[in-house]
UniProtKB/Swiss-Prot annotation:
Protein name, per record: Troponin T, cardiac muscle
Chain's gene name: TNNT2
Compositional bias of kind Pro residues: 66-77
Domain of life, source organism: Eukaryota
Residue(s) carrying Phosphoserine: 2, 195
Presence of keyword Acetylation: yes
Gene Ontology biological-process annotations: cardiac muscle contraction; regulation of muscle contraction
Length: 285
C-alpha cells in the first residue's frame, strides 16, 4: 500500500468520525430544545400539580453528560474542485521514478569515475614500475662499469708494482756490481765525505721526482701522435688521481682504526684501574 492510499484511508476515517459526532451533537441539542421549548398552559399546570400531589415531588431534570471530544473539522474543499487521487498517486509515482533515475545516474557516474581513477592508478603503477626497472638497469650498468674500471686499475697497479720491483732488483744488482769494484767504492766514499752531510727528505723527494720526470719530446710528432700522447698523459693523470684517492681512503681507514684501538686501550686501562682499586680497598678492609 502506498503513502497516498494510507493518507486517503486516514482522511476517510477522520471524516466518518467527525460526521458521527456532529450527528450526535445535533440530536442532543434538538432533544434539549424540545423539552425546554414546549409552552406550559394552565391546564397542563393544573394537571402537573395534581400529578405532583398524587405522585409526590418529581425529580429535577438532569442533562445527560456529554463526553469530552474535540471537534474534528474536516478540511474544506473549494466548490467546483475535485480531488483526483489517481492524479496524486500518478504524480507520486513519477516523483519516485525521477528520484530513482537520479540515484541510478549518480551511481553510474560514481562508478565511471572510480573506474577511470582505477585505470589511471594502474597506468601510474605501470609507469613507475617501468621507471624503476630502467633505473635498476642503469644502476647495474654503472656498477658493472665501476667493477670493470676497478679491475683494470687493480691490474694496472699490480703491473706497475711488478715493474717497480723489477727495476729495484735491477738497481740493487747494479749497485752490488759497482760495489764489487774497489775503485768505485772509494769514489763513492769520497763523494759522501765531500758532501759532509746526509741528504734531507726534501732533497730526496726532489731527486726522486727528477728521476721520474721525463722530458716530453713532442717536436717531431704530428697531430695524431700528439692526440695519442695527450690521451696517454690524461690516462696517467687519471691513474695517479685514482691511486691518490685510494691512498687517502686507506689513510682515513687506518686513522679511524687507530682511534678505535686507542679508545679501547683507554677503556681497558680505566677498567683495570678501577678493578685494582676495588681489590686494594677490599684487602685493607
Amino acid at each position: 500500500m502506498s503513502d497516498v492510499e494510507e493518507a486517503v484511508e486516514e482522511y476517510e476515517e477522520q471524516e466518518e468520525a467527525a460526521e458521527e459526532e456532529h450527528e450526535e451533537a445535533v440530536e442532543e441539542e434538538a432533544g434539549g430544545e424540545a423539552e425546554a421549548g414546549e409552552p406550559c398552559t394552565a391546564e397542563d399546570g393544573e394537571e402537573e400539580e395534581g400529578r405532583e400531589a398524587e405522585d409526590g415531588p418529581v425529580e429535577e431534570f438532569k442533562p445527560k453528560p456529554r463526553p469530552f471530544m474535540p471537534n474534528l473539522v474536516p478540511p474544506k474543499i473549494p466548490d467546483g474542485e475535485r480531488v483526483d487521487f489517481d492524479d496524486i498517486h500518478r504524480k507520486r509515482m513519477e516523483k519516485d521514478l525521477n528520484e530513482l533515475q537520479t540515484l541510478i545516474e549518480a551511481h553510474f557516474e560514481n562508478r565511471k569515475k572510480e573506474e577511470e581513477e582505477l585505470v589511471s592508478l594502474k597506468d601510474r603503477i605501470e609507469k613507475r614500475r617501468a621507471e624503476r626497472a630502467e633505473q635498476q638497469r642503469i644502476r647495474a650498468e654503472r656498477e658493472k662499469e665501476r667493477q670493470t674500471r676497478l679491475a683494470e686499475e687493480r691490474a694496472r697497479r699490480e703491473e706497475e708494482e711488478s715493474r717497480r720491483k723489477a727495476e729495484d732488483e735491477a738497481r740493487k744488482k747494479k749497485a752490488l756490481s759497482n760495489m764489487m769494484h774497489f775503485g768505485g767504492y772509494i769514489q763513492k766514499a769520497q763523494t759522501e765525505r765531500k758532501s759532509g752531510k746526509r741528504q734531507t727528505e726534501r732533497e730526496k723527494k726532489k731527486k726522486i721526482l727528477a728521476e721520474r720526470r721525463k722530458v716530453l719530446a713532442i717536436d717531431h710528432l704530428n697531430e695524431d701522435q700528439l692526440r695519442e700522447k695527450a690521451k696517454e698523459l690524461w690516462q696517467m693523470i687519471y691513474d695517479l688521481e685514482a691511486e691518490k684517492f685510494d691512498l687517502q681512503e686507506k689513510f682515513k681507514q687506518q686513522k679511524y682504526e687507530i682511534n678505535v684501538l686507542r679508545n679501547r686501550i683507554n677503556d681497558n686501562q680505566k677498567v683495570s684501574k678501577t678493578r685494582g682499586k676495588a681489590k686494594v680497598t677490599g684487602r685493607w678492609k
